[in-house]
């Protein structure tokens, strides 16, 4: 009978340890989600350059973002026809602001990016202006 109670105690301890471990992992996952940072970027294309800007993203930039740990959330053009050929809007996600800074530095220093940028701008700059806003999700946001 003593063996039975000893085994039951060990089994119970194992269950408690497993539950605590799972709770701890869930807490880490929540904290990780809470620290994710999003970046909203708006590019104002140079006149007549939106097609070239979209091509550069499609053919080069997106792959380089992924290479440097930049999670692409989505890309948009405004639905207003007057603005559609002027703006490219997109959102990236990162584990933290520090990770974003590190990723952008690596991206900008990447010889593949420099080559793609220079080739795409042989007939002039594609972008007149860039706006960037880093954002943290609210506690009620469905996306974190």
Describe the residue ranges of each PLM region.
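A short, glycine/Asx- and small/polar-enriched loop/turn
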Residues: 83-88
């Amino acid at each position: 009978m003593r063996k039975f109670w000893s085994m039951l105690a060990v089994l119970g301890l194992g269950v408690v340890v497993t539950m605590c471990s799972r709770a701890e992992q869930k807490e880490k996952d929540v904290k990780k989600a809470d620290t994710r940072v999003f970046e909203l970027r708006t590019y104002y294309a140079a006149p007549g350059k939106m097609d070239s800007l979209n091509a550069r993203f499609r053919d080069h930039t997106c792959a380089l973002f992924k290479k440097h740990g930049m999670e692409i959330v989505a890309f948009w053009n405004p639905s207003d026809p007057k603005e559609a050929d002027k703006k490219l809007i997109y959102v990236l996600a990162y584990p933290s602001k520090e990770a974003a800074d590190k990723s952008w530095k690596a991206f900008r220093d990447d010889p593949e990016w420099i080559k793609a940028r220079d080739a795409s701008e042989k007939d002039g700059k594609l972008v007149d202006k860039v706006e960037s806003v880093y954002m943290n999700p609210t506690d009620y946001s469905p996306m974190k």
